[in-house]
Amino acid sequence: MLYPKEFDVIVVGGGHAGTEAALAAARMGCQTLLLSHNIETLGQMSCNPSIGGIGKGHLVKEVDAMGGAMAAATDEAGIQFRILNSSKGPAVRATRAQADRVLYRKAIRTRLENQPNLMLFQQAVDDLMVEGDRVVGARTQVGIDFRARAVVLTAGTFLDGKIHVGLDNYTGGRAGDPAAVSLSARLKELKLPQGRLKTGTPPRIDGRTIDFSVMEEQPGDLDPVPVFSFLGRPEQHPQQLPCWITHTNSRTHDVIRGGLDRSPMYTGVIEGVGPRYCPSIEDKIHRFASKESHQIFLEPEGLTTNEFYPNGISTSLPFDVQLELVHSIRGLENAHILRPGYAIEYDYFDPRGLKSSLESKAIEGLFFAGQINGTTGYEEAAAQGLLAGINAGCYVRERDAWTPRRDQAYLGVLVDDLITRGVTEPYRMFTSRAEFRLSLREDNADMRLTEIGRELGVVDDVRWDAFNRKRDAVSRETERLKSTWVNPTLLPEADAVPLLGKGIEREYSLADLLRRPEVRYEALVALQDGRFAPETPLADDTMLAEQIREQIEIGIKYHGYIARQAAEVDKLEANESTKLPPNFDYTEVRGLGFEVSQKLNQHRPETLGQASRISGVTPAAISLLLVHLKKKGMGRAAAQTSATPVAGNGQEAA
């Protein structure tokens, strides 16, 4: 049957990508439908009970800056918060939280059910409705047709998913949930390029059977307790709990080696490639054979359960081997396994078949987000979901898509990596992937993205007002520090030495003094009983005031480095803004070479910058392409822009 109401946007899947996509489209005013096989598992944390980390926390902050749900839900569900790399520079500091699974799911469900313009419906999707080269809706397993102008597909690991425990396997999207077999078959009929990937999860342990007395306690940060959302407050956090650390040992490693003959990974049963940066314990023992032990973090799953997640021993070994493996670890000698670990293979679709908006190049109005694009991790999925939801809304409203640049957001780095380089293994975000990471910090995600989010319609009045107060205060106080001058008379040696280590010999601005590594803003404005403090407080709200102080201090201390990075961005901007014709035949470019023209014809980059990052496309090839475009007058940007070739792989254009 045809459902009587037509929607603007349909989102298929209710995981981290799907929920952010649905919320974003609805915030833009689009009539949105979220279809899930089970609305009880919306926002489910299928693997580890944590959010954030290096690179990942940056993505969560960016999602939050644009009104997304993940950070706020984590503040309500987080049972431990830590700032990683706190002793290092601000570019690589990252927030990480342990979350209560039940509270997190509840926080997401509450937002979904109370979001205007958003409706939920429980049914598995078996088919996409496609007319010509355009998607027009989705069909459920009982034959209900829902029509929409745009569809966002966020199927996670469910597409033809196969779960492995030892040499036994069965179809499933995750433990306890069915696989999306029919939908996977339908997508293959559409001739979209696809492959198989694999991920895994460890056995879960009953905390009542763990001997914590022989383990190292790992508490969270308590003074102060961090928050994830820019609007978050520590008072929102539930009770805080510690994690615990133990290690594998030589006996553990012997058990694992003895079970490799029944490992689906080492007997060829699993064909999909697993995540490099979250390897199974089998992989660790095999790849790092000389390492005597590996760290294991025992992470609580929540406040109302005894279940623990042993982070570090993801495995698909047979259950009897898993049991012996767990019992070989100190503190787990008598542990009871509540759920076996397993690996899951699933279909993904080559993200090089997507535009930078995450819309399919082959099927108009169809957007992909999350693990279906070859990524791994809740945070990467949520960020893609936000972008796909926004651009589905832009598509419906006939507005230009929003495509964040690499210098603008980690989300821009993520999407650009996916669509230009593709994936051969599950992709996860690290700060090292960003060339401009000094400008892409957690602390300034709102300064980079909230105004854009407001223009797109995804940032509400509460966030916008808080952001404006912060931005105005940062600007006002930074200018005051630059224009307030002190000399040896105003700042005598007795006052200067505790702050600077020596007296000042000439006139300095307060900004000059703050630029010194050892000087903190709080100490500077506290000099001489607050003589150099602003006339009014930075903000009435203590959390907002702390954010303002942080922005002021980082902005002044790192001004020179940030300015140099901005100059590098300007040099590359010409390439990024030079559009390439969508149906251009690259074999027409003389001297380009067969391999390069073949790759460009295959991947269809949207800009010269994207073309430069495709494997095998050299700076010489980019120069030839630019000359050809100018000569033919193809595209206003190409005709008017003097683009700068960027570094390639050193090969010549043949």
From Swiss-Prot:
Question: Which NCBIfam families is this protein grouped with?
Answer: mnmG_gidA
Per the record, the similarity remark reads:
Belongs to the MnmG family.
GO-annotated cellular components: cytosol
Please verify whether the record's keywords include Transcription.
no
- Give compartment(s): Cytoplasm
Name of the protein: tRNA uridine 5-carboxymethylaminomethyl modification enzyme MnmG
Q: Which UniProt keywords apply?
A: Cytoplasm, FAD, Flavoprotein, NAD, tRNA processing
A biological process (GO) annotation for this entry?
tRNA wobble uridine modification
Q: Where are the transmembrane segments?
A: none
Annotated residues for binding of NAD(+): 274-288
Listed under subunit, the entry gives:
Homodimer. Heterotetramer of two MnmE and two MnmG subunits.
Name the cofactor(s) required for activity, per the record: FAD
Gene that produces this protein: mnmG
Q: Name the positions where FAD binds.
A: 13-18
PANTHER family hit by this protein: GLUCOSE INHIBITED DIVISION PROTEIN A, PROTEIN MTO1 HOMOLOG, MITOCHONDRIAL
Its source organism is Cupriavidus metallidurans (strain ATCC 43123 / DSM 2839 / NBRC 102507 / CH34) (Ralstonia metallidurans)
Task: Return the InterPro entries for the record.
Answer: FAD/NAD-bd_sf (IPR036188), GIDA_C_N (IPR049312), MnmG (IPR004416), MnmG-rel (IPR002218), MnmG-rel_CS (IPR020595), MnmG_C (IPR026904), MnmG_C_subdom (IPR047001), MnmG_C_subdom_sf (IPR044920)
State the function annotated in the UniProt record: NAD-binding protein involved in the addition of a carboxymethylaminomethyl (cmnm) group at the wobble position (U34) of certain tRNAs, forming tRNA-cmnm(5)s(2)U34.
* One Gene Ontology term of the molecular function aspect: flavin adenine dinucleotide binding
